[in-house]
Amino acid sequence: MQNPIFTAAESGLDNLLDYLPSKLESMFWSFSTPTRFGQKYRAELESSSDVTVLMHANVVDITTNPSETKVTSLKIRSLSGNEAVINASRYIIATGALENTRLLLASNTINPAGVGNHSGMVGKNYQNHPHVDIGNIVSSDPQALSALYERRAPSGQGDNGFRLGVGATAAVQEEREILNFSASFQEEEAKKILKVMWNEIKSFNWPTDFSSKLKMAVEDLVGQEKRLSHQVYMYTEQAPNEDSYIALTDQKDALDMPRINMHWKLNALDKHTVKQASLVIGEELGRLGVGRLNIRDWVMQDDAKFPSSTWGGCHQIGTTRMSESAEDGVVDGNCQVHGIDNLYMAGSSVFPTGGHTPPTFTIVALALRLADHVAAGSSAS
C-alpha cells in the first residue's frame, strides 16, 4: 500500500501518467544536500557530556574473551603508528558495510575465521542496487515525458532536487515473480549537451570545449530516424546470494590491515527482474500512447548476464545481515552479533535485503533504534 503522504503529493500533480494500479506506480525521489557529519554536528559533539570523539583513531582489532561470547576491548591505531586500547561495556561497529565486514574478518586472534563468523556468514550476501540502461523511448512528442519526468533542481541547489519515475506495484511483483524496481526517464546525452551549451550562450558565456561538445552532440543525433526522446534507467533490488561476498586479501594497507576483495555477483532472478520490469514499462507506455520502448538486446536474453556498464550506486548492503539464527546471518533483530553479548553492528550491512531505494534514510532510522535499545539496556543494568 502506498504511503498516504505520497498519495497526497501525487494529487497535486494532475498530469502524471495514469498507470494501471496493478502494473506500475509513480515514484518520487528527493535528493538532500550533502551532509558533512563533522561540520554539521561538531559544536554539538564538542559540547556533549556523553560523547568523546577520538580523532585519527582507526579501529584495527576487536578482541573477545576465549569463548567468543563477549568483546573485551578494541585496538586503535593511527597512521603515524600510535596504538591504544579502548575498553567499554558495549561496542557498536558503524563503519559501513565494507569496513564492518573487514574489521570482523580481520579480528582473528581468537578465531581464525574472525569475530561473529561461526557459521561463515560474515561478508556473504553482498548486495548493491544494480543500475542499468534498459533502452530508449521512441516518441512523437518527447516534451510530454520531459515535462513529467526530468530531474529538477531548485535554483542555486546544483544537483540537489527531485525526480519523478515509475516503480513496481506489489501486484506486478507477485504476478511476474520479480524483485522490486524503479526506473527514471532521462534525456538523451546529446540533448543534455545542447541545452547546457545554449544556456551558456544565452548568458553571454561562450561554452568551454565548444567544438568537442558539439561533436559529441552531433554524433549522438546523426542517424536517428525516429524521435529517441529518453533513455530509461532502471534501479533494482538484488536478490541475496552467498556467491556475492566480501573477502580479505593478502595485501595490507597503511594501517597494516588486510585489504578486501569484492566479489559482486548478480544471478538469474536479478536478470529476470530487469527483463520483466522492462516489458511492463514498455506495455504501459504503449497502452498510454506515450511512446514505444526500444529494449536493449541484452535485457531480453534468458540468462544471468549483465553488461559491463552495470554499477551498484555505491550502496553496500547485506554483509552482516540480520537473521533469526546465526546459521542464516550475523546479527539478530536488535543488531546484536549472534552469540556475543555486547557487540552490535550498525549500517546497511545488517539489511537482510536492500529493496531498490537508496539506503541512507533506513540506515539512520536503524541507528536511532539501536541507540534506544542500547540506552535502555544500560539503564536497566
For each feature predicted by the language model, list its residue ranges.
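FAD cofactor-binding and catalytic pocket of flavoenzymes
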Residues: M1, S119-R259, A268, G313-Q316, ...
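Conserved redox-cofactor binding core of oxidoreductases
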Residues: M1-N65, V71, D302
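Beta-sheet entry/capping signal
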Residues: D50-V53, L74, E83-I92, N125, ...
